[in-house]
Amino acid sequence: MYEAVIGLEVHLHLKTRTKMFCGCRADYFGAEPNTHTCPVCLGLPGALPVPNRVAVEHGLRLALALGAEVPERLVFHRKNYFYPDLPKNYQISQYDLPLGRGGSLPLGERRVRIKRLHLEEDAGKSLHLEGRTLLDLNRAGSPLIELVTEPDLKTPEEARLFLQRIQALVQTLGISDASPEEGKLRADVNVSVRRVGEPLGTKVEIKNLNSFKSVQRALEYEIRRQTEILRRGEKVKQATMGFEEGSGKTYPMRTKEEEADYRYFPEPDLPPVVIPRDWLEEVRRSLPELPWEKEARYRALGIKEKDAEVLAYTPSLARFLDQALPLGLASPQALANWLLADVAGLLHERGLRLEETRLSPEGLARLVGLFERGEVTSRVAKSLLPEVLEGQDPEALVRERGLKVVADEGALKALVAEAIAAMPEAAESVRQGKVKALDALVGQVMRKTRGQARPDLVRRLLLEALGVG
């Protein structure tokens, strides 16, 4: 019996106005190539770096949220290697005094341990065409935080979930958009396979995975590959692998470097960054409610466990729900149901995000409240949702169109009698115990009321009229 052991290295672009060590704008996505550069990020002689205070503070927020230990001073190091999109031939990173050590992230019933977090600058981007390579250095020098886990993950699904949780956390903290599509969240995975109970196997790294799906697919393939090697009695070779999206297979890129290969040494142009304790405490006090704290609060409000988890780890939905709940217009679980089913379905159908609509927390809460109080039927409420999504007032729509539930039993009994007279065969079937035939009669009455009667009330009145207990 074989098992996988997985660790992740997560690279997150920090949401700052300027780059990590210079004044170039950091919003390079979609810009003309090589327009967000300067002597510092191009590595020109004599250009000196200056640390970005906002980037350091963003890093502190993440470290504190994860419960990591933050040192009294940060030291930057040069990580030396040659690659065309690294104009200095070294990357300013951190080594033995990183931003944070330890901490953990909740994942189900257990916690995934964090080994370290460190700040660094990003490299540029290479575009490989036929017979040539183009370089775009807009990204070079952009602020990154790298988060390294302990090898606590066991399956590709867990790795994917961990990345989704980290994405939700940094979005909640407001320190990163963490959009894989824009390259603002990238992951390298380290995976080895061993027999259960045996020491760790040989580690293989898969580089530059830029979507959650890619991480899962790459791990699934690599675990199968290593397992087959071990079953043949052969040894897995330590290597760095790439992942080919089309084939779903990993492929060798180069042999795996060791730390010594990078020849780390302290960055001579940057003095240590001192982290005063009062600054650290100020950052700690500014932390928002974290997703796992939010999940616990939702569950305490009576929201189902799975619903609470999805809402808490989807920042846009959590923000919306947290504005709707204090209004007291609808129950927490009903709001959760509508957000996760009806609203989510309509957004998916239209290809929209929640923040791209005019749906307000109050508007949805009023619509759900109308349904919960029995003032409109489920059918009517759902039919109004597209207009409420456009910013319409649901209560005004109900008033203007006369959509309130028909609750007058006298009027309904007359419609029930008409339905029975119009559908004698269905009525006789119900009298003979074939209760499914009742649905046709209910439908007839509902059509007469334009869907404004409560189906349960119509059903009861029909059974009474047919003399069926």
UniProtKB/Swiss-Prot annotation:
It comes from the Bacteria. Its EC number is 6.3.5.-. GO terms for molecular function: asparaginyl-tRNA synthase (glutamine-hydrolyzing) activity; ATP binding; glutaminyl-tRNA synthase (glutamine-hydrolyzing) activity. It catalyses: L-glutamyl-tRNA(Gln) + L-glutamine + ATP + H2O = L-glutaminyl-tRNA(Gln) + L-glutamate + ADP + phosphate + H(+); L-aspartyl-tRNA(Asn) + L-glutamine + ATP + H2O = L-asparaginyl-tRNA(Asn) + L-glutamate + ADP + phosphate + 2 H(+). Keywords: ATP-binding, Ligase, Nucleotide-binding, Protein biosynthesis. InterPro entries: Asn/Gln-tRNA_amidoTrfase_suB/E, Asn/Gln-tRNA_Trfase_suB/E_cat, Asn/Gln_amidotransferase, Asn/Gln_tRNA_amidoTrase-B-like, GatB, GatB_Yqey_C_2, Gln-tRNA_amidoTrfase_suB_CS, Gln_synth/guanido_kin_cat_dom. Allows the formation of correctly charged Asn-tRNA(Asn) or Gln-tRNA(Gln) through the transamidation of misacylated Asp-tRNA(Asn) or Glu-tRNA(Gln) in organisms which lack either or both of asparaginyl-tRNA or glutaminyl-tRNA synthetases. The reaction takes place in the presence of glutamine and ATP through an activated phospho-Asp-tRNA(Asn) or phospho-Glu-tRNA(Gln). GO terms for biological process: glutaminyl-tRNAGln biosynthesis via transamidation; translation. PROSITE patterns: GATB. Gene3D superfamilies: 1.10.10.410. It comes from Thermus thermophilus (strain ATCC BAA-163 / DSM 7039 / HB27). This is Aspartyl/glutamyl-tRNA(Asn/Gln) amidotransferase subunit B. The lineage of its organism: Bacteria, Thermotogati, Deinococcota, Deinococci, Thermales. Heterotrimer of A, B and C subunits. Belongs to the GatB/GatE family. GatB subfamily. It is an enzyme of class 6 (ligase). The keyword ATP-binding applies. SUPFAM superfamilies: GatB/YqeY motif, Glutamine synthetase/guanido kinase. PANTHER family: GLUTAMYL-TRNA GLN AMIDOTRANSFERASE SUBUNIT B MITOCHONDRIAL AND PROKARYOTIC PET112-RELATED, GLUTAMYL-TRNA(GLN) AMIDOTRANSFERASE SUBUNIT B, MITOCHONDRIAL.
